[in-house]
């Protein structure tokens, strides 16, 4: 028989033992019940009596079958940080790293002290000639020189020039520089300043023929800062020519030039393949008794 059947049989016997006194209770008289109550032992179906003393421990049972491994538990909370450990020994030097990129340029340092003077260097090559300086002030008239040799039959003193421009639209109220020399007899015209400077006192004739385009033209002939003649020509959309001429009595050192006398009316036009603008002057005759006259 199996253990289960043994246990079932034992329980059945216990229940049967409890049921027999209860079944006999109706058949017993009052006498019999009184005897039971007075001194007889209590039956199972009567009221429970006091708890009896514990029985002796039973023999240990056999070990059960090992159960399955449970699921892993959840991670517990992190513990507090431990105390800092002692410093370890210094390790061996590492390998040399790659060269870094060049850093930004630093600020200029303070100027250092002047070093000792070096030896004299080799002489350099001569430089280019500088631009001509400004014309100096006119000097005092010198004393008369000794009489020169006779030049009977020779011509009188000469002074004549004819010049042209090489740029368009000159600035107003300044001498126009006619820098293309066609003739400069005696060298009395200064191309750098645009002025004719009288060296032979006498009567002179001056004339000009100016080409204009795209702008109006207001030009005048100036003698020692004063306008002697003025010419105005309006722009018609085509090339045009403005002309003027006069005769002047000049003394030694007098200056004559052309200039624009009104703002934004400087229509003088230069075209090397089409037209020229000319300024011309020459001596008609010198004053009597002039030392330059032969």
Curated annotation (Swiss-Prot):
The protein depicted here goes by the name Complement C1q tumor necrosis factor-related protein 2
Ranges annotated as biased composition (Basic and acidic residues): 75-87
User: Would the keyword Signal be found if you checked this record's keyword annotation?
Assistant: yes
Provide the Collagen-like domain boundaries: 48-150
Phenotype upon gene inactivation: Knockout mice are born at the expected Mendelian ratio and appear normal with no gross developmental abnormalities. A reduction of body weight is observed in male, but not female, due to increased metabolic rate and energy expenditure. CTRP2 deficiency up-regulates the expression of lipolytic enzymes and protein kinase A signaling, resulting in enhanced adipose tissue lipolysis. Knockout mice also have altered hepatic and plasma lipid profiles. In contrast to lipid metabolism, whole-body glucose metabolism is not affected.
Q: Which GO terms describe its molecular function?
A: identical protein binding; signaling receptor binding
Q: How does it assemble?
A: May interact with ERFE.
Name of the encoding gene: C1qtnf2
Residue ranges, compositional bias (Low complexity):
105-129
Residue ranges for the region (Disordered) are 42-156
Residue ranges of domain C1q in the record? 154-290
Q: Name one GO cellular component term.
A: protein-containing complex
Q: PROSITE patterns attached here?
A: C1Q
Annotated Pfam families: C1q (PF00386), Collagen (PF01391)
